[in-house]
Amino acid sequence: MDTITAVRNRILQLCGEREISINKLATISALPPSSIKNILYGKSQNPKLITIKMICDGLNITLGEFFNTQEFDNLEHEIK
């Protein structure tokens, strides 16, 4: 799995666990909905760390908690 897919999956997982929409996530993260949708729908292939941090802040989790999944542990190498 590549990094952007893991990020997308994690955002969707966290929203599902909290039963919140993408628009609600945008509101609580102080981001425009388009920023999150661009990540989820593949328009943004390299989301900024600050954007992910803002999502984490909105969800009241740390960056460590965001990235602490098997998907991130098993990422394929980006440099080939």
Regions found by a protein language model. Give the residues of each.
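Short, charged recognition helix plus adjacent turn
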Residues: 13, 38, 67-80
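Intrinsically disordered, low-complexity basic tails/linkers immediately adjacent to helix-turn-helix/homeobox/MYB/SANT
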Residues: 57-68
